[in-house]
Amino acid sequence: GFIGKGMLTAAVCGDIFASPSANAVLAAILAVSGPSGCLLIVKNYTGDRLNFGLAAERARAFGHKVNMVIVDDDIALPDLPQARGLAGTLFVHKIAGAMAENGADLDACTSNALRVINASRSIGMSLDTCTVPESPKENRIPYGMAELGLGIHGEAGIEQVASNGAADAISKVIDRLAATMPDGAHVVLINNLGAATVLEMSILTHSLLSSHIVDRIKFIVGPAALMTALDMHGFSVSVMALSTDDDTLLSQTTTAPAWPGCKAVAATLVLPLPDGLSPVRVPASAHEPTKAFLTKCCEQLIASKDDLNALDAKSGDGDTGSTLATAASALIDAMDSLPLADHTQLYRAIGLELSQTMGGSSGVLLAIFFAAAGDASSAGKPMREALQ
């Protein structure tokens, strides 16, 4: 996926979670190397280092110019003598590949690859390990837990932590990364380890760009499945401190099909509502008995969320309780802005609030109901008849 103009010229694969043989690496070197030479970009795993290193020595014996760099961007286990290579490798692929495409010589590409490696940091988190074909799955991560710092081959991480949603997961990852990040601008890469859904990755990315390091993040790559671990249900985050021209090299066009592009991070542009869509609200008014009654009703709906969802699941999609609880919470939050002392206006205000905060058929039906109740009340009907 990363072979193309402006990135890699070749990739050498072994069996699943096994390094390629030295002969396979040598064959690739001999097939693609010209007078300018060849740069091997290798993740820091023992088999890869040995086989690529041996192949490089053999290629040099044939008269080829071959350099090799080792990517060791994992920060999960700081006491490990040899840090593992993770998705920060993609920064090396892109920057060295763009430089080579622009005509830089082997030594310049190598020195910049080493600089990028030194500037890159990565860490991952997953809800589950991966399934290796023809091997029993290691179910070491209990339900409701996540493992922080595991490797791309399923290697154990630094600790297991409670799984408390996207914002909490990003916070745990970012806290580790932030401690190693120098001041200045960075690029971030958010990587799907294999089985996370598009929705999950989007939520994780939103949480990342809402975190306390966002002021230091100038560019983002992903979210995308860039360095996967088969069906691992997790993600990793990589950061790299930017130097001169790095943003240009990262943004440079490539024909490699798996590269998702590098985009500038910018604040979300929020536009005002067009004329006619901004709601016209009547002045708020206080009435404690009405407020207490409405609050009690809303609290009852919130408490009944799970029961209502279970009932709805028998014939529908199981979200009625969640929908009503969301609307009830919004109504409680808006309570002090409602015209509680004027029931006619209150019905209409509740309908307007529900139309804005409650989705699905329930929202529009209840909005119509309360609007009709407001009309009936304005026509002089008592509360019981207005609500029929």
Regions found by a protein language model. Name each.
Residues 1-388:
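N-terminal loops that bind phosphate or other acidic moieties
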